[in-house]
Amino acid sequence: MPGAGSRGPSAGDGRLRLARLALVLLGWVSASAPSSSVPSSSTSPAAFLASGSAQPPPAERCPAACECSEAARTVKCVNRNLLEVPADLPPYVRNLFLTGNQMTVLPAGAFARQPPLADLEALNLSGNHLKEVCAGAFEHLPGLRRLDLSHNPLTNLSAFAFAGSNASVSAPSPLEELILNHIVPPEDQRQNGSFEGMVAFEGMVAAALRSGLALRGLTRLELASNHFLFLPRDLLAQLPSLRYLDLRNNSLVSLTYASFRNLTHLESLHLEDNALKVLHNSTLAEWHGLAHVKVFLDNNPWVCDCYMADMVAWLKETEVVPDKARLTCAFPEKMRNRGLLDLNSSDLDCDAVLPQSLQTSYVFLGIVLALIGAIFLLVLYLNRKGIKKWMHNIRDACRDHMEGYHYRYEINADPRLTNLSSNSDV
């Protein structure tokens, strides 16, 4: 039939165009989908749509107040007035800067996260307003190697701030470098006034450094610019791995109570810009016993009197002090700016000065003698009547004895009285 014949070719052309369109669509879907997810003939259209709209996983989030670099594994939250540690820190962070913010307290578990910040190695918290660091504040940072708390006015540093519950023989702190420069609070914020407050502050820092075995792996410790007057006893007793110790720009007047004997790995000891006047033999002997140490002593007010003689002799022989040629006298006035290495015994007036121990002995002896004299006078005063009677008896006895002696002398001197006395005796 003509009608049927006329419809046949047009219908065939339509089917051909549909087939070509289907092939084009199949090619586009195959090109946009991953090679491993090419659909089979039995795949549904929904699967085609899902495979075509697949996207790569989103990048780790960065806290809004911070700058993050995943390539450098660094997060910087600097001068953002943060009041606490951001909660959404990315787990890849290795170097974290939280400086110049407004955090006043660092509570226990301040860095506890899920997943944990296991790769964090360097943490800088300097320049905040931290006043309190609680026990276990860094407990959930198993990879932490370097911690900087400088320029924070710490009034309460827990004895377990660097330890936490994991500070034991089997699990000491991983810290290798601890920076505590200028953490002393202002004078008006110290407890019990200025001097007592400084003593309490020194004890607080010492307690945190010697808490158990937490810091036995510490190799670098910086305590500069903290106004220390003395180093607390046993401050360094639990730090056997220490290689670098910075105590410059304090107010140290003596190292009498400090012991460096167990710091067998110590390489650098910085004591510049303190108030040291002389170093005693016990300290010099400890330094001499440390195989690799170098001690820096510049800018101290050395007093060049007889007490300096042993130190001068030691300086002339030792190689422990690299800057010894720059050490000069500050007192007395006539010795000002004289180099310590240029001094000899005649310059130090040793003949006119007694050893301090001998001076102390003489003072003590004088006090004892004065006390004995006072007690003796008090006893005499209380027994004055009896003493007066006793003295009268002695006087009478002496008088009788002298009268008898005088009588015998007169008889012996006159022969007539002698014969008379003999006849009388007969």
UniProtKB/Swiss-Prot annotation:
Region of interest called Disordered, as start-end residue ranges on this chain: 33-53
UniProt feature, compositional bias: Low complexity: 33-47
Residue stretches making up the LRRCT domain: 289-352
Modification after translation: Highly glycosylated.
Statement: the UniProt record of this protein carries the keyword Zinc-finger: no
Disulfide bonds: C62-C68, C66-C77, C304-C329, C306-C350
Cellular component, GO, one term: axon terminus
Topological region Cytoplasmic: 383-426
Record remark on domains: The C-terminus of LRR N-terminal cap (LRRNT) and LRR 1 are essential for the inhibition of the Wnt signaling pathway.
Stated name of the protein: Trophoblast glycoprotein
Organism of provenance: Mus musculus (Mouse)
